[in-house]
């Protein structure tokens, strides 16, 4: 009897996976794509939720999701995923891998359609173009000497594997200029805050090393994701960590810039694919498009 029950469970699991995996093929034959729900993502500074959905309305016809829903914090978006308000949490691959490593019920997977590449850089006010150039020069030097690769291992790969790095201690330069950097804590392991309230993550380590090389002081300022634009414009912070879509200029119908007005960005220091976090018991986990 036990063997029979086990066999039935195995067959049911295989059938579920098969049916889910066949959705894309069936859609190709019928010309329609089955919709499962909405995609969540963190709020953007340069475009509203409605504007993004309008730009992507033609693309979303071929998506397994209905529309995008913005969230101000990663915690809010995770709760929405677990409640079923959204079926996909969309962000950069490193953050999705981190989320999946800390949540047994969540899987990481590529998007249904071809993933965009996300480019990591820093956003500054337009009048701080000289500082932008100095930071870009530091990024180039850190790429050349291998510092960025070492930081990726320590602050991304090791953290995803379960290790916690030492606290990041900025070097003090008495009398030197202080640059204030916004930390949201919403994109671990790139940008997060420890249980003790200390800013951690790859981005924090990177800007700390940049400040050291420029012989500047650095101050981390906790800012919510949605308030980054206001914080930058009003001088609460001087730098915001920023992600751009790598092929944004090819987006058909995009009539807005991929960054807020009156800002400049540094040269990129990393690029990773856009990625999905989905519940393991969701049919979406096994739905892939044959690109």
Please give the residue ranges for each predicted region.
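Positively charged n-region of N-terminal signal peptides that target proteins for export
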Residues: 1-8
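Bacterial N-terminal signal peptides
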Residues: 9-18
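Sec-dependent signal peptide cleavage junction
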Residues: 18-32
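Extracytoplasmic small-molecule ligand-binding "clamshell" domains
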Residues: 28-92, 134, 150, 173-251
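Extended ligand-binding regions for polar small-molecule ligands
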Residues: 37, 43-50, 54, 115-162, ...
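Periplasmic-binding protein-like
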Residues: 100-137, 185, 259-261, 268-278
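Short beta-strand-centered segments that line the small-molecule binding cleft or hinge
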Residues: 107-111, 228-244, 248-274
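Flexible loop/hinge segments at secondary-structure junctions
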Residues: 144, 163-168, 175-180, 184-188, ...
């Amino acid at each position: 009897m036990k063997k029979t029950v086990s066999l039935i469970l195995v067959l049911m699991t295989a059938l579920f996976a098969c049916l889910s995996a066949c959705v894309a093929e069936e859609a190709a034959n019928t010309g329609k794509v089955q919709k499962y729900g909405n995609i969540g993502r963190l709020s953007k500074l340069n475009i509203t939720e409605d504007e993004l959905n309008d730009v992507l309305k033609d693309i979303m016809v071929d998506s397994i999701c209905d529309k995008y829903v913005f969230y101000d914090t990663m915690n809010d978006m995770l709760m929405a995923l677990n409640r079923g308000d959204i079926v996909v949490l969309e962000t950069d691959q490193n953050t999705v891998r981190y989320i999946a490593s800390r949540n047994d019920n969540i899987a990481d997977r590529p998007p249904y359609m071809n993933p965009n590449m996300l480019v990591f850089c820093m956003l500054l006010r337009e009048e701080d173009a000289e500082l932008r150039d100095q930071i870009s020069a530091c990024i180039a030097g850190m790429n050349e000497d291998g510092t960025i690769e070492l930081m990726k291992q320590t602050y991304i790969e090791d953290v995803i594997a379960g290790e916690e790095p030492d606290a990041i201690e900025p070097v003090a330069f008495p009398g030197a200029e202080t640059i204030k950097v916004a930390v949201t804590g919403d994109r671990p392991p790139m940008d997060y805050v420890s249980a003790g309230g200390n800013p951690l993550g790859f981005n924090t380590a990177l800007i700390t090393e940049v400040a050291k090389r420029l012989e500047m002081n650095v101050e981390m300022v906790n800012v919510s994701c949605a308030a980054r634009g206001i914080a930058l414009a009003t001088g609460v912070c001087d730098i915001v960590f920023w992600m751009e879509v790598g092929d944004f200029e090819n987006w058909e119908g995009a009539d807005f810039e991929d960054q807020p007005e009156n800002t400049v960005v540094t040269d990129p220091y990393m690029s990773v694919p856009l990625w999905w976090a989905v519940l393991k018991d969701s049919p979406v986990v096994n739905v892939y498009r044959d690109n």
